[in-house]
Amino acid sequence: MDNVQNEIFYKKVIELFQNARKNLSAAVNMTMVYSYFEAGRIIVEKEQDGKERAAYGKYILKELSQRLTKKFGRGYSYDNLKLMRKFYLVYSKDSIGETAFPQSEKLPVTKEGRKFYLSWSHYLVLMRINKIEERHFYEIEAYKNRWSKDELTRQYGSSLYERLALSRNKEEVMRLATEGQMIEKPEDIFKDPYILEFTGLPELVTYSETELENKIIDNLQKFLLELGRGFTFVGRQVRLTFEEEHFRVDLVFYNRLLRCFVLFDLKIGQLKHQDIGQMQMYVNYYDRKVKLDDENSTIGIIICKDKKDAIVEMTLPKDNNQIFASKYETVLPSKEELKTLLEDKNLE
């Protein structure tokens, strides 16, 4: 009897992949994502239906792996089948609203009402994330920004969710999980810290500000990924001249979503109040001499190795929404440390 049931089980999964391969098209990867989910469902149902010992369940999966591999080739190893099982267990109980996704997106829907918007390699990364709100955030952002699997891995490794959440209130943090990062006001593009691990510079500062700037320019695409959506590079060491004096802004960008210039000044030491005053001058110049009437106010961001929040707060006006100061790190942050900071913040 067991052999008959096992044969039905094997045949059911094989037929699933046969049908999936008949639908090969530009959406082949998406088709396979749904097939992996359904395969996970069949495997879990087989486990729940029987009373087999764990060792026998392992034997069943290994036998299924051999049959699928013989039929279709690579991609159906025992470990991959376990990932399909995990995929079903995670996403059968994971619902996500469609407000962050195009309503016209015509995708299949699982029995649980779930749609999948990314490739299998993306979901392999997402399945590592235990916290559902954080997992939703990365799924939405990966879709919105068309992140590759490597870009998603980098953003998760740099703790983007925690860094954004630290500068937001509880309501805004919940919004991250349902809508992703919304760029509507100057504060929305701000991160603290900025992660510049792609520069390859050491954690201990043994380099100049010019070297830091050069490394950023050499890795401009990666810096743009760190900045987020809407940024376009304008120039480096952009000269401003008035009263026969020359000043230079380290990096100038334009954000298409906010419709404003964003100026960056790099400081490898501790932030001084004079640095904030200098950025205020740059911002005023752009607002009065460069931006068009229908564009929004210029934003200035000072990226420094260290800062004292009290100095920033006392130097800037209370209603400031144009100038920001953030630390930078040249190594990936500890996710545990950031999560602890976020938990402490939520208790305040």
Please identify what each model-predicted range represents.
Residues 1-348:
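Basic, low-complexity intrinsically disordered segments
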